[in-house]
Each structure stands twice: as C-alpha cells, then as structure tokens.
Amino acid sequence: NGSMYNTPPCFGIYLMGLVMKWGLSQGGLDAIGAANQRKAGKLYAEIDRTGYYRGTAENNSRSRMNITFRLPSEELENKFVKESTAAGFDGLKGHRSVGGIRASIYNAFPEQGVKDLVGFMQEFEKKHG
C-alpha cells in the first residue's frame, strides 16, 4: 500500500545534517584532521617539555582525541583537577580505574582551548613544580 516499514529517525538525521554542515564550514575532513594534529601536537609538546608531566601512551600510539598524562604524585593530580576546574576547565580527571589526567580534545574543541590549557599547565608547574 506504499507505506514505510519503519519511521526514519528524523531527529538523528537532522543532527547528522548539522554536523555535516559544520564539518564543511571548517574546511572538510582534511582541515579538521590538520587542526586535530595541531591541537594534539601543542598539548603533547607541553607534556614532553620538562618531564613534570608524563604521557601515559607510547609516542607512536598517542591519541589525537584523548590525551592522558600523569603528574609526579596523586596528590598533585588531585590539586590539578581541583585548580583546573576552578579555572574553567572541565572533565580533566582521568578514568576512575586508571587515574591521572585526561584531556579530551574532540573535533569541535577549539584550538584556543588547547592554548589555554597549556598555559594553565605551565602556571601549575611553576606553582607546584
């Protein structure tokens, strides 16, 4: 009788359309990939700069999206999370079974946010290092 067998997930299709339009407005996949590489590179450069922060992934296995690292002690990690939250950063506490710090810098996370986080990390190291 010409009826559809199911109802398409209209809201999901609408949201996917918005995401695709956003991606195109950013220059497409190549531009988004390059931006993600720059963001991750800035954060990893800070982690590797002095040894105060220690990356948890091997260099050839580092994620561009979820950057994990440790501080010299669990006490300092707790201070880092508390002070970073007070400074406006959210969700940096690592996984409950692993600990440490996890910065999630997904596609829509702005490069300025990474610059701000790196600045916070440098100030934290000066204060507590």
Predicted regions and their residues:
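A short linear hydrophobic-aromatic micro-motif
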Residues: Y52-T56, G88-G94
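Short, well-ordered beta-strand elements within core beta-sheets of diverse protein domains
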Residues: L24, I67-R70, I105
